[in-house]
C-alpha cells in the first residue's frame, strides 16, 4: 500500500486546524499556506507528524519558509507515535508560508495549497492535490488538550477557547457541481484572496 504518514498543522493564532495534510502515499509531507493580513500579526503554528514506520527507519525534518525566509521549527514533543513541532512568525503583509520535508519539485507539486484570510476569517482549500486535507475550526478539544498545553510560547488566551463561530470554510468537493455549490458571496471572498497571490 505504500508509506502513509499523517500530518496536521494547527494555526493556533487563528484557532484553525489543517487536518490530513499528508500525501495519500509517499515519504514526503508539506503544505503551502497563503495568508492575508491587514496589519502586523503573530502566527503561531503547531505541526504534528505521526510517522508510518512500516517502511522507514527515520522521519524527515519539517522545514518552514515564510516569504522565502527560513524559519526555525522547534521539536517540543517526541515519541514513537508522533513528533510535534512549534514555530512562530510575525508578519506585516500578505504572506506565503511553506512547510515541507523535501525540496524536490516532484514532491512539492503534490503538496496542497490553502488560502487563509485573517481579516474576513475565511479559509479555503485552493488545491488539495494529492491529499485529503480538510479544516477544523475551532481546534478540537482533543488537539487543544494534547498539543497546546505543550507549546510553552503560547499564552493561556489560546487554550480551550471557542472564538470562531463566524468563520467561513470552503473546500473543493470535486463533485463537478462547483457552479451550483458556490454562491456569489463565496466567489467574491475567494477572488479577494486569490488576487493577492497571483
Swiss-Prot record:
Family membership: Belongs to the poxviridae C7 protein family.
Region: Disordered, residue numbers: 171-198
Lineage, top ranks: Viruses, Varidnaviria, Bamfordvirae, Nucleocytoviricota, Pokkesviricetes
Signal peptide start-end: none
InterPro entries: Poxvirus_C7/F8A
Official protein name in the record: Probable host range protein 2
Role description: Plays a role for multiplication of the virus in different cell types.
A GO biological-process term: viral process
